[in-house]
């Protein structure tokens, strides 16, 4: 059975971009006769507020987007994340990083077209000699308690097919770099928490904005490390030794098990449910399952008149403002359905009424400007 999820961060009121994502995710799962679960990603201790989360749930119900089962709160799952971080550490794939954002920005220019900087491994164990002096300068007068924890990634290509944007081949070292899995303040980073929760909650379909497209290869690789069977891990031991020795020579991966398992080579580990994980859906999961059967669907972003993606600072687009104007949920859904290409007019409609009309083939790939 398809199990989709909506995983918002409760750092403010939902805006139309969030609702657009929730609607497409709900329609995609429900049109297949599946479940749709809610996970509250309240990992940021400074910005996440329970009141925002409760308001978010009220907004979803008001819109006609009910979820299955009880919501899962990431802030309550620290012990689970600790366990999986330890697994990565035991593999020799994590290291403390002393670099600040300013350090990173000062040593390299933005690499990706969206302005992101790909971390080049300054603090990686046994770095090439040109990096060593810089690292020693960074560690002066810094306590290990102020470090982030990064995951060592291989210099290899992850192939995957997005259900809406098609095939991609992403080189982890070039486009992602060694990424943070625990912040220096102790908070859990997005990638680790998401991968663990999606696997343990039995999520089979991930729908989100195209700005997170590059998270897919990172998460596929991390799933491989955490949930691949022991026998398959042995096949990739040589690759990990090369990584931790700092050998970054580019190579063509002909055996996908050296980087990520293929459908033919995969021997998935059966993952037993643990106490609390049944909260993810009505009645919970009833058996072991493979955490690898995940489909990704990314959607275009809703942007303001200046072409910038909507954010929680766009107050005229948030549900607090919109509900205050007296607009109905059917009007909001009707407008979003029209923008998604599901209908030919903005006629008010409910999510349930949209189910027979839904198809990913109708959804545009270009970002959508709100005027």
Residues covered by each model-derived region:
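N-terminal Rossmann-like or analogous alpha/beta NTP/dinucleotide-binding catalytic cores
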Residues: 1-112, 211-227, 331
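Short helix-capping/linker segments at secondary-structure and domain boundaries
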Residues: 29-35, 201-202, 227-228, 340-347
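Active-site cores that bind ATP or allylic diphosphates and position pyrophosphate for catalysis
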Residues: 102-134, 138-230, 269, 290-310, ...
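Catalytic adenosine-cofactor/nucleotide-binding cores of aminoacyl-tRNA synthetases and other
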Residues: 100, 214-215, 289, 293-371
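Intrinsic disorder/low-complexity segments
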Residues: 128-146, 228-293, 371
């Amino acid at each position: 059975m398809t199990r989709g999820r909506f995983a918002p961060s409760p750092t403010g009121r939902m805006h139309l971009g969030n609702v657009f994502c929730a609607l497409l995710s709900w329609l995609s799962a429900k049109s297949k006769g599946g479940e749709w679960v809610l996970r509250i990603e309240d990992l940021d201790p400074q910005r996440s507020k329970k009141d925002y989360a409760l308001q978010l749930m009220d907004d979803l119900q008001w819109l006609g987007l009910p979820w299955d089962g009880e919501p899962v709160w990431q802030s309550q799952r620290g012990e689970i994340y600790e366990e999986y971080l330890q697994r990565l550490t035991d593999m020799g794939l994590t290291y403390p990083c002393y670099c600040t954002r300013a350090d990173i920005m000062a040593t390299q220019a933005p690499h990706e077209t969206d302005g992101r900087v790909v971390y080049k491994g300054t603090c990686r164990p046994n770095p090439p000699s040109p990096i060593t002096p810089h690292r020693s300068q960074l560690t002066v007068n810094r306590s290990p308690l102020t470090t982030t924890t990064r995951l060592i990634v291989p210099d290899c290509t992850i192939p995957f097919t997005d259900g809406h944007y098609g095939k991609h081949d992403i080189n982890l070292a070039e486009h992602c770099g060694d990424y943070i899995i625990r912040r220096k303040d102790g908070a859990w980073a997005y990638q680790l928490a998401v991968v663990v929760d999606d696997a343990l909650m039995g999520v089979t379909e991930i729908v989100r904005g195209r700005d997170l497209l590059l998270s897919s290869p990172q998460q596929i690789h991390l799933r491989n490390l955490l949930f691949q069977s022991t026998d398959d891990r042995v096949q990739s031991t040589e690759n990990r030794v090369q990584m931790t020795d700092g050998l970054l020579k580019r190579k063509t991966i002909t055996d996908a098990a050296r980087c990520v398992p293929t459908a033919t080579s995969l021997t998935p580990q059966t993952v037993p449910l643990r106490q609390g994980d049944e909260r993810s859906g009505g009645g919970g999961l009833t058996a072991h399952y493979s955490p690898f059967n995940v489909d990704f669907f990314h959607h275009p972003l809703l942007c303001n008149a200046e072409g910038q993606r909507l954010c929680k600072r766009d107050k005229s687009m948030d549900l607090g403002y919109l509900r205050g104007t007296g607009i109905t949920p059917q009007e909001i859904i009707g407008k979003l359905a029209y923008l998604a290409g599901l209908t030919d007019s903005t006629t008010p409609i409910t999510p349930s009424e949209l189910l027979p009309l839904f198809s990913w083939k109708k959804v545009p790939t270009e970002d959508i400007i709100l005027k």
